[in-house]
């Protein structure tokens, strides 16, 4: 769950909320299940309506519900990050929420917490991102051309074109056809397009594919 743009641009992360809460569906789905509106967490609305933009307010709200993550993998991960990365061993609560935020925010503004420096500091050998079949992988190309020693490779995830109930399925199919220069009006043309894109991903360093199958359908 990393964005290749981070490592291509190598810019400071904006703030704790938009790094650790807003983009993480494991976090906001838990809060949503307990009645927290997604707009209060800064999640964009489909209708373009207003959402919370103050990262401190988002973080404060997160701290009020942090107890929900006790005993979960997400909670264990957060506790580890707070203690080992930012040096805060106490439990996050609404009372110390501001202190947590300030500590993380200050750290994110230092060179040590630039995306590439984090990879180097933790001796991460390889990061594999998850990318749609129609991705141009432009950010991966920037990383490869940058001279940086870190390794960030794509993973081929064709759900957007293989899942016919995906809301953007037809748009994605058209985009796939444009990328390979073929009108995808037959199943064989579709399979050939996937093979072409998979080969492109392999040439960009991909070593795996990722498929989300929500409901397996029997043959009979």
Description of each model-found segment:
Residues 2-220:
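Metal-cofactor-binding active-site regions of metalloenzymes
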């Amino acid at each position: 769950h990393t964005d290749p743009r981070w490592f291509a641009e190598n810019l400071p992360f904006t703030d704790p909320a938009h790094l650790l809460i807003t983009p993480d569906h494991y976090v906001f789905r838990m809060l949503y299940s307990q009645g927290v509106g997604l707009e209060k967490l800064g999640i964009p609305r489909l209708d373009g309506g207003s959402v919370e933009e103050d990262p401190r307010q988002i973080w404060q709200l997160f701290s009020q519900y942090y107890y929900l993550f006790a005993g979960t993998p997400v909670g264990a991960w957060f506790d580890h990050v707070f203690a080992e990365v930012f040096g805060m061993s106490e439990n996050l609560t609404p009372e110390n929420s501001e202190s947590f935020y300030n500590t993380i925010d200050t750290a994110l503004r230092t060179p040590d917490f630039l995306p590439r420096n984090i990879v180097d500091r933790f001796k991460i050998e390889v990061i594999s991102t998850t990318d749609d079949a129609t991705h141009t992988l432009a950010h991966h190309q920037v990383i490869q051309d940058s001279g940086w020693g870190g390794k960030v490779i794509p993973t081929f995830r064709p759900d957007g074109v293989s899942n016919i109930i995906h809301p953007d399925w037809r748009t994605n199919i058209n985009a796939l056809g444009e990328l390979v220069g073929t009108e995808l009006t037959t199943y064989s043309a579709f399979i050939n397009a996937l093979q072409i894109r998979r080969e492109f991903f392999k040439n960009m360093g991909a070593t795996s594919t990722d498929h989300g199958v929500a409901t397996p359908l029997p043959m009979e």
